[in-house]
A protein has these predicted regions:
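Canonical positions in the second alpha-helix
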Residues: 18-19, 52-54, 86-87, 123-124
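Canonical tetratricopeptide repeat
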Residues: 32-33, 66, 100, 138
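Short coil turns that delineate tetratricopeptide repeat
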Residues: 23-24, 57-58, 91-93, 128-130
Length: 203
């Protein structure tokens, strides 16, 4: 780590390679090698090294999150989605990972990905008790994208009375206005309303 602190990334990576040649199961050397490669801007090599590491240390959630970030930076969103799926399998109650997964799927953008994104935005909204602003905006945006593409939505959420409510984007938009009214009143609320109106699919 002294070499890394001095910005000597290539020397650091070479050192970790020597350590791993002698001790392939050295967990710390694997992780520091990834950091050294990232420090050099070698994102593809860092992703490859991290993939090799995760083949052995599959329970390292921090590693899966980092690999997802690397894949996003490389424009490899389907690979990033796979990494986030590993996080969701480990901790399905983490609303932030549902939101992240949905955002990556929304970036992929085909109809199947958008429908799945909508389901995970709905899960994030439920798990966060309606306080995940990113998921709320995402639910509205994905519904608009589905409507624009002519694809149907498949998400149904439960209303307070126990009946099924299909208008997830409508509920999300209402909650967003409520949150901004409570926490950021003033000129921001009309801007939020205008943004939501622009996103809502025309009927």
């Amino acid at each position: 780590m002294v070499l890394e602190a001095k910005g000597l990334w290539e020397e650091a990576a070479a050192l970790y390679d020597r350590i791993l040649a002698a001790t392939p199961a050295h967990e710390g050397a694997h992780k520091r090698k990834v950091a050294a490669l990232r420090g050099q801007g070698k994102l593809e090599a860092a992703a490859t090294a991290l993939t090799t590491y995760l083949a052995t240390w599959q329970a390292d959630l921090e590693g899966w999150a980092e690999l997802a970030e690397l894949n996003i930076a490389l424009g490899q969103h389907r690979q990033a989605a796979f990494c986030i799926e590993e996080l969701l399998l480990a901790v399905p109650s983490a609303s932030m990972w549902h939101t992240w997964y949905a955002s990556v799927l929304a970036t992929i953008g085909d109809a199947d990905a958008l429908r799945t994104a909508q389901k995970h935005y709905a899960a994030a909204i439920e798990l966060s008790e309606g306080d995940d602003v990113r998921a709320l905006f995402g639910a509205v945006a994905v519904a608009a994208a589905l409507a624009k593409s002519g694809a149907s939505s498949s998400v149904v959420v439960d209303g307070e009375d126990g009946d099924s409510v299909a208008d997830l984007p409508g509920l999300a938009a209402e909650r967003l206005v409520q949150l901004y009214t409570q926490k950021a009143p003033g000129q921001l609320v009309p801007l939020v309303k205008a943004a939501l109106q622009a996103l809502r699919p025309s009927k």
